[in-house]
């Protein structure tokens, strides 16, 4: 008799995706982050669901409802901090996942890569709207500053901002709609992640060498299920340590002050995972130019497959490209640091130089270096 997992319509899909899936025999721990992102998404949806049971999306009671969750709801503090720090873990995994894709040439799977870029935008939008919900000082002013950027769009900018606000400033209507969108978007992200996997399983996974691995495939279960479980355990260890020992490490103290439209915080800044993009935005003195640079800092990922000039897929055997990749990583860390600093000398010039270097590396230096490596190998 044929095994049920190979005949049952539902089990067949699960079987071909997680059990009998042929996987390259040499994929390293850098390939663990896809499953970790799935776990992060599940954690965020579950904790978010329980938070939504007690949260009220009204400007008068939003801040109090979050305080109520932390003080009066059974394990409410745990759920709240798991959700807040879960977002940080989500972005750490996201950045490492994208970095892996860049290093090993996974972007050559065009459909998978483009869905991934779309997912990145969706997760960033969700995180931004989630940050507004506690209605602290940084929530309110962050929402005001970021939504105001849309006013830089010619002709329709001002109308667009007022349409998003639902009035003439960030107020009750804004908070209510942000809560609605923040609730629905994770489910859209889950659906997109399904499409992401669908496209990936059409081509099969890439591997560190960047070479075709069809001649040497192994079943996903038990080899990579065990490997993924180890990754998940490490993720849970890091997340619980963060939540139980220093839950406010990655947050902003200003958000423990209720939102006050009459009092501007000295330094308005987003959560740490947006600081690199915020630094690029601030490095351009022109409003529209800054907004374009902000969008392009993420959208540039979609262009990378078309700038691949090397005859090798992976950077594993390309030392010059490796150097540029790690310079790019250092540059992004520099931008993250600059994004959290006040707008004054020397931070302004450092931010501008780091922003120029970011685009220069991706759009110019990396493609030229790849051509040089081809030439050195006489290809």
From Swiss-Prot:
Binding-site positions, heme b b562:
83, 182
Q: State a GO cellular component annotated for this protein.
A: respiratory chain complex III
Query: Is-annotated flag, keyword Membrane?
Result: yes
**Gene3D superfamilies from the xrefs?**
Cytochrome Bc1 Complex, Chain C
The transmembrane residues are 33-53, 77-98, 113-133, 178-198, 226-246, 288-308, 320-340, 347-367
Q: Which Pfam families match?
A: Cytochrom_B_C, Cytochrome_B
Q: Where in the cell is it found?
A: Mitochondrion inner membrane
Q: SUPFAM superfamilies attached here?
A: a domain/subunit of cytochrome bc1 complex (Ubiquinol-cytochrome c reductase), Transmembrane di-heme cytochromes
What is the first-listed, main subcellular location in coarse terms? mitochondrion
Q: Could you confirm whether the keyword S-adenosyl-L-methionine appears in this record?
A: no
One of the protein's GO biological processes: mitochondrial electron transport, ubiquinol to cytochrome c
The record ties this protein, via InterPro entries, to: Cyt_b/b6_C, Cyt_b/b6_C_sf, Cyt_b/b6_N, Cytb/b6-like_sf, Cytochrome_b, Cytochrome_b_C_euk/bac, Cytochrome_b_N_euk/bac, Di-haem_cyt_TM
Required co-factor(s) are: heme b
Q: Record's CDD domains?
A: cytochrome_b_C, Cytochrome_b_N
Which residues are involved in binding a ubiquinone?
Answer: 201
Function as written in the Swiss-Prot or TrEMBL entry: Component of the ubiquinol-cytochrome c reductase complex (complex III or cytochrome b-c1 complex) that is part of the mitochondrial respiratory chain. The b-c1 complex mediates electron transfer from ubiquinol to cytochrome c. Contributes to the generation of a proton gradient across the mitochondrial membrane that is then used for ATP synthesis.
Miscellaneous note, as given in the UniProt record, is: Heme 1 (or BL or b562) is low-potential and absorbs at about 562 nm, and heme 2 (or BH or b566) is high-potential and absorbs at about 566 nm.
Q: Which family does it belong to?
A: Belongs to the cytochrome b family.
Q: Oligomeric state and partners?
A: The cytochrome bc1 complex contains 11 subunits: 3 respiratory subunits (MT-CYB, CYC1 and UQCRFS1), 2 core proteins (UQCRC1 and UQCRC2) and 6 low-molecular weight proteins (UQCRH/QCR6, UQCRB/QCR7, UQCRQ/QCR8, UQCR10/QCR9, UQCR11/QCR10 and a cleavage product of UQCRFS1). This cytochrome bc1 complex then forms a dimer.
Q: What is this protein called?
A: Cytochrome b
Instruction: Provide the gene name from the record.
Output: MT-CYB
């Amino acid at each position: 008799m044929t095994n049920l997992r190979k005949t049952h319509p539902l089990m067949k899909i699960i079987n071909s995706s997680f059990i009998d899936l042929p996987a390259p025999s040499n994929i390293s721990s850098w390939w663990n982050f896809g499953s970790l992102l799935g776990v992060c998404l599940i954690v965020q949806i579950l904790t978010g669901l329980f938070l939504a049971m007690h949260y009220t999306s009204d400007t008068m009671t939003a801040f109090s409802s979050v305080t109520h969750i932390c003080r009066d709801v059974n394990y409410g503090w745990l759920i709240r901090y798991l959700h807040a720090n879960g977002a940080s873990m989500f972005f750490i995994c996201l950045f490492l996942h994208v970095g892996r894709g860049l290093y090993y040439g996974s972007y050559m799977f065009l459909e998978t890569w483009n869905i991934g870029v779309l997912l990145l935008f969706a997760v960033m939008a969700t995180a931004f709207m989630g940050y507004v919900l506690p209605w602290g000082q940084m929530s309110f002013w962050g929402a005001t500053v970021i939504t105001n950027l849309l006013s830089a769009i010619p002709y329709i900018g001002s109308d667009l901002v007022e349409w998003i606000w639902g009035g003439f400033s960030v107020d009750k209507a804004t908070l209510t709609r942000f809560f609605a969108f923040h609730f629905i978007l994770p489910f859209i992200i889950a659906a997109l992640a399904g499409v992401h996997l669908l496209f990936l399983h059409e081509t099969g996974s890439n591997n560190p060498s960047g070479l075709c691995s069809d001649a040497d495939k192994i079943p996903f279960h038990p080899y990579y299920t065990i490997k993924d479980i180890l990754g998940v355990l490490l993720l849970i260890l890091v997340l619980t340590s963060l939540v139980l020992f220093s839950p406010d490490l990655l947050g902003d103290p200003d958000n423990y002050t209720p939102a006050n439209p009459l009092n501007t915080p000295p330094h308005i800044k987003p959560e740490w995972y947006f600081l690199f993009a915020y630094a690029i935005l601030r490095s351009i003195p022109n409003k529209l130019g800054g907004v374009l640079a902000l969008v392009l800092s993420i959208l540039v990922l979609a262009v990378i497959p078309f700038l691949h000039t090397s005859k090798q897929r992976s950077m594993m055997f390309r030392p010059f490209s490796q150097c540029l990749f790690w310079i790019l990583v250092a540059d992004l860390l520099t931008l993250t640091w600059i994004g959290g600093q006040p707008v004054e000398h020397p931070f302004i010039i450092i931010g501008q130089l780091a922003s120029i270097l970011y685009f220069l590396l991706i759009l110019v230096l990396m493609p030229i270096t790849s051509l040089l490596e081809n030439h050195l190998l006489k290809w």
